[in-house]
Curated annotation (Swiss-Prot):
<dbReference type="GO" id="GO:0004385">
    <property type="term" value="F:guanylate kinase activity"/>
</dbReference>
<protein>
    <recommendedName>
        <fullName>Guanylate kinase</fullName>
        <ecNumber>2.7.4.8</ecNumber>
    </recommendedName>
</protein>
<dbReference type="InterPro" id="IPR017665">
    <property type="entry name" value="Guanylate_kinase"/>
</dbReference>
<dbReference type="InterPro" id="IPR027417">
    <property type="entry name" value="P-loop_NTPase"/>
</dbReference>
<keyword id="KW-0547">Nucleotide-binding</keyword>
<dbReference type="InterPro" id="IPR008145">
    <property type="entry name" value="GK/Ca_channel_bsu"/>
</dbReference>
<dbReference type="Pfam" id="PF00625">
    <property type="entry name" value="Guanylate_kin"/>
</dbReference>
<comment type="function">
    <text>Essential for recycling GMP and indirectly, cGMP.</text>
</comment>
<feature type="binding site">
    <location>
        <begin position="22"/>
        <end position="29"/>
    </location>
    <ligand>
        <name>ATP</name>
    </ligand>
</feature>
<keyword id="KW-0963">Cytoplasm</keyword>
<comment type="similarity">
    <text>Belongs to the guanylate kinase family.</text>
</comment>
<dbReference type="GO" id="GO:0005524">
    <property type="term" value="F:ATP binding"/>
</dbReference>
<keyword id="KW-0067">ATP-binding</keyword>
<dbReference type="InterPro" id="IPR020590">
    <property type="entry name" value="Guanylate_kinase_CS"/>
</dbReference>
<keyword id="KW-0808">Transferase</keyword>
<dbReference type="GO" id="GO:0005829">
    <property type="term" value="C:cytosol"/>
</dbReference>
<keyword id="KW-0418">Kinase</keyword>
Amino acid sequence: MSETTHTAIDTAYPGNLFMVVAPSGAGKSTLVNALLAQDKAIRLSISHTTRSPRPGEQNGREYHFISVDEFRAARDRGEFLEWAEVHGNYYATSRVWIEEQMAQGTDVLLEIDWQGAQQVHKRFSNAVEIFILPPSLTALEERLKKRGQDEPNVIVRRLLAAGSEMSHASESDYVIINEVFDDALKQLQNVVHATRLRFSSQKARHAELFIELGIH
């Protein structure tokens, strides 16, 4: 992963920034989609990419599809929070969009890997990192097989990568073990709700009230 160097932002935006991290097969996307469907006060950050759209993909839904020249220009202007080159294509997270949303009081969620999460923390020190774990390695392997998306050799590589990825769970703020989906979803919702009640979040959202009450 790469980044444009920035100073960490400690500004208390009315909106919160959440990062959900997990190895492939842990159920991250399914949990995130369920959360977004039930909580309209949080928005998913859509990445920018230079790769071509796949069948069924729509610009602005799965990705923001842009040209290499557009990508490089935005990167050089410091508009990306973090970016990476994968298999000859560029991918990035928009810093500008995230700051705009949070300034308006909207919570933002990133589906991201642990390396990207480290870069985000350099820019947003108050970002909340949530790590999703499988109940066991056996369960993780079974889920990868049931998806039917990968060849056996790819599954082996994903399992090997998962071990390295999960070693970074200790860097997160919260850990959710996704054994029973409904329980995991409830726990994810609880993290979001609790974060909104933090002193810094409440002060940013209710600045005038806090001033009136003499709370600093």
